[in-house]
Amino acid sequence: LRIVLEHITTSDSVDFVMESDVNMAATITPHHLRIDRNALFDGGMRPHAYCLPVAKRSHHRVALRQAAISGNPKFFLGTDSAPHPRKDKESDCGCAGIFCAPVALESYALTFDEEGALDRLEGFASEFGPRFYNLPLNDGRITLKRETFKVLETVSDGDLSVVPFHAGETLSWRAADRLASPMPVDNN
């Protein structure tokens, strides 16, 4: 029986997976590699940093980063993207979840770059998951390019508006394949 702990958030879960046999693995989200619980209250309540499982203390984030960049095939990408409408996130009972899909790969690349482990990103993002599930590797390719861009504050479609992860931030990696397609970026 193969067991995957989806979207781990603690150093305890990292240790548990490391100590388990080869049939145990875990996914790690881009946002849990970038934020800790302080992001929820930075200058006030930040509903767009609220997700479940909730981001934990900084030492847990550090442990997740070390697991992700380790090259250990028991840890692999799991975005857990949650595109809740802005009005539902910014309400008195806001929805949990972070909309990371538009910049997930760029966010992972930023983390791996900061940790000096870009050579291990492909395994984490593209190989370890399929191999764990005994699935063929995808034939497609995505090229990440070191190129700065500013993530839009919101992504809108008609009356629907969603705030993406890294909204308003300038990132230093970009999926080259997306350069011509619509995504939440501002090149100004």
Label every PLM stretch briefly:
Residues R2-R120:
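Active-site-adjacent C-terminal substructures of enzyme catalytic domains
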Residues L105-N188:
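Mid-to-C-terminal alpha-helical segments outside catalytic/metal-binding sites
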